[in-house]
């Protein structure tokens, strides 16, 4: 039973008896003197006599658990306590011996695992009555998920909404399951997909997650880790029919789970790991262990850990947290479990357990012992950024990837069945209906089949619908044999007097016609396999924009981002419009960005957020603005002229003098003649396809993406019919579709060898290069008006993203307290980066680029770099698939926090994938040039433009770029050889210390090791030239690469030295590019050809945050003012009837004392673990110990962090309750997010202007009526209730004495600011009272938000309510609340609480922000713009 390998004469340092295989303790124990060596101790041990009293700690668990590495490490440390002896009960004893024969012990550590006889352990505890570390009776409950959830609910711990399905014949009332296609109903509770299905037994790890059909359907099947897999995707969508299960709501966690490990109620270690539901691949390190990352818990999460520990009476307890929607939810409690591979945790755990045991048992053994109180030396690990600028925010707007050609058919329908369908799905509410779900499309198909059957019986019956159109509708809906829900949709629009009547204007005779519906069927437009590869590769390339790392895990590009993301230092959100191709592009990009594997469906569901509910990325393409109609009509008129372009045509069609536009017009000359040629080529093409179909060899011919010759012919025949109308005129709107189709066939179906496609591509591209960009406006003013109309919500969101970046980081920080000796190999870069990725369609990309080009960001006459950028953009002919607009925000920590140089913005752009016809003709840009603090002089001066005329630039992805002083590229410059390119594909480029004689002192790059040494991380061999590491080496975003290169410089293989001379000719600035697919060795199964993606080009790298913020605000305001003028008359007529009662009252923060966690030594160990446990790997859990270095406190009144406000304000658009008007919308929208016991805490907002500018409002106070008037005029739709500004100011003045809920640490400048704010507040309120008549101009729909109390008291007096978005005249939409971290933590310095109260009082007063009217109004409805549908064919 007992394995005692040591002699009876042992030293005072007790040992850990493991049998003959014990390898010893390894390191000195706590009781050892540091000057004693191990040999001296061993010699002394023979002469020493062990002390009489010994506390025996018994370990009763299965051998696999009791001899695991974590248990061994902890017990070794536990043995270093004097008076403690650890004994392990063997598995044979536990299983086969009666409990009476088990040796007695004073303290028992026992826990259940598979095969463990828990009944015997309970019997033993009753027999011997030892001190239990983990309660045994409660372990029965932990084995049943139903009991776990019941206990969690009783303790008031948040958990996902769930229902239990008990398949028990004795209780049939608990087994009511109704399964639908996209939902299940369990005992009356409905769970729409995605939902989770868990077996009730906690020992059964076969958890299934079911996905909605709109995301591809199927399920992810989770299981206990087997090798490198933890889940697998299955196409099965039906729930299990046998067994009892818990069904619960799926929580979107952005692909990471948090595992929490408690040791007593006051210690909790947390780690993040990749969610097994994401792709099922277990990330392992070089030793084969699952990679996990340290995470800092918030105050509320520490409270949850304490509750779990106490409720289940388990001192050592592990549980799973899901962070979603601004809250933390417990989804599983595992009982006894240890952290793996954390030396710090082993030390902490052993110390806490030892102290707990000694505190409980030492008195009865008369052992002199007290808890050690010496201060622990925990140095702060310094950051490595030095003086480099730190990447803080990346915002990218990206077009979707390569797709199949989009196709559309319109028909007018009048059958009652279509009207019934329209009514059933609520079409009459808005007059429009969009049907995408499989069951909806099935209804349309059923109606179509029924009408066709009736037409066969009665060809001359009452059915008015055209047979040909109905048959096409039927064939499209029947394609593929099933509805995927993302590649076909039907739109119905109601016309009260028939479609033609509405089209032809006010015709009295027409108005008597019966109403009809316009049915628009859209299909195609699916993301192709090539598009998926493009998106995934671009995602991999994007990794390299983030801070890099060192150590064992730095063997591949972009490893810095991966560890950044998993440690929650990366605040990532991916948004996509509701189009399937856009969502799949976003999912594929996320897969590459985060090195995920497996199917796209689970990634899409968990990582991609739909932004279609508020117009952020979607636009109602069927309703064009009046400006778009004018532009389209003028464009069609010019292109219908059968004559060569004259000077006046150039003035009319190309007033902006765009280089690409002029080039295309030169090619076209006579538009009608070119259209004749295009039409003849299409006729020839359809003739060739028909001939191929007659060829017996083509019977089973499969084209790209499973298309057949019949479908291909259908595509081209429809274009042939539609392009030339019966009148002989051409429908110019079909030109983009023709170009789309021929580009697709040349790229993907080139093997057919159809004649004339190259010429058709050349001519249709020339026409498309005129039509497509000019549809978004011809003159600068039109381009800007249409652009802002498309992307106003997105512009506001980008502005919010930039302003939210400099927020308090205490929520997302890694653990700041870390032993230096534990820091080696820890994946924890000290950065916090916010990333917002917006995937959308061509319209938004065109529009956003137009805003930057024509909105007046900079004066090109004064800024040479911006002039070069505009010249480059002017030469871009097409914004192709995967076009990117990237905004990067850096912070220079060496600058004064109030300085304009503190934050630095860069603007980058890529026109997406290369067209197949563009070899050698692409315009050259300025290179990718992130600013570097070590090359300040290069910021604005580098990168002179090459000749923008076509044909001058190289087609190489890493083509040469000259800097200003350099001579032009010589004709003899060799291109980079395939050998170098191949080697680059297999390894990460790192710095070589070779120096160049060229200006600027660039350091060039070569391979660090052969491809075979490349660590496999999911990148494969397709990671060629992803990002210009030449730039990254000196870039503010990747300073660590320099260190990496210096440390690895001597490892350069001979192969790279052989090409050093050639490398010296490599351009100084290479581009961020994805160029793998051109190389023959880099093929991709299922892809005919994946075009190269153009590298990112820097448009400007010396912008300040203030410049960009003011520019975006100005553009938004200009649009708002323009619409206000159009609706001023309507506003004036409505405004007199508005009441101005019930003014907005700002929410008050209530004071609540910090939660006191009392130490209760008389209780079992799960109630307290003693003072030494107050410092945990997740930071101090108890407020009794105040650490000056810690940045978190403990409060039972948590506050949501700024992510909530961001999602709320930037996306959700504060809700307006019908009938209650504007006076209620001000606080309703925000209060939805708070629990009843919480009080709203204002999120941190830091103004980019110095504090000294706070005094500015004082000077502008006399003009307070003007901003109010401006705001009033800016709204085109009246609200029903109007707040009175004068009353509001009065109320703010009266409420000025309320104290704040929490007292953060106050910095000195902020104290000055607070006094200034008090002065401003008093002056403003006094002025409001004196000038109530002037001020009382009603501001409809606008709630003026008072000055905010924020972390460190950055009072944003100079920046008005950033996001008071009121969606006027439209129903309130659901507000997405995806927040990675739920709560904001503040440090509370107890000693300074009293003296800081006065400063708090000053700041808690309501301060109306009057110097800048609200910038944030949604796009108002243009009452004059009528939808004019296209001609029905």
From Swiss-Prot:
Phosphoprotein recorded as keyword: yes
Xref: InterPro entries? Acid_Pase_AS (IPR033379), His_Pase_clade-2 (IPR000560), His_Pase_VIP1 (IPR037446), His_PPase_superfam (IPR029033), VIP1_N (IPR040557)
The EC class name is transferase
Q: Region (Polyphosphoinositide-binding domain) spans which residues?
A: 382-453
Which SUPFAM superfamilies does the annotation name? Glutathione synthetase ATP-binding domain-like, Phosphoglycerate mutase-like
Name the positions where ATP binds: 145, 198, 205, 224, 248-251, 257-259, 275, 320, 332-334
| Effect of substituting residue 399 to A | Decreases 8-fold the affinity for PtdIns(3,4,5)P3
**Where are the compositionally biased (Low complexity) regions?**
1168-1186
Broad class of where this protein is predominantly found: cytoplasm
Tissue-wise expression: Widely expressed, with a higher expression in skeletal muscle, heart and brain.
Subcellular compartments? Cytoplasm, Cytosol; Cell membrane
Q: Name one GO cellular component term.
A: cytosol
List residues modified as Phosphoserine.
Answer: 944, 987, 1037, 1073, 1145, 1152
Q: State if Ligase is listed as a keyword.
A: no
Among the Pfam families in the record, one is: His_Phos_2
Q: Which GO terms describe its biological process?
A: inositol metabolic process; inositol phosphate biosynthetic process; inositol phosphate metabolic process
Which intervals carry biased composition (Polar residues)?
Answer: 1005-1020, 1134-1143, 1187-1199, 1236-1250
What Gene Ontology molecular-function terms does this entry list? 5-diphosphoinositol pentakisphosphate 1-kinase activity; ATP binding; diphosphoinositol pentakisphosphate kinase activity; inositol hexakisphosphate 1-kinase activity; inositol hexakisphosphate 5-kinase activity; inositol hexakisphosphate kinase activity; inositol-1,3,4,5,6-pentakisphosphate kinase activity
> What pairs make up the disulfide bonds?
none
Family designation: Belongs to the histidine acid phosphatase family. VIP1 subfamily.
What is the protein's name according to its record?
Answer: Inositol hexakisphosphate and diphosphoinositol-pentakisphosphate kinase 1
Q: Encoded by which gene?
A: PPIP5K1
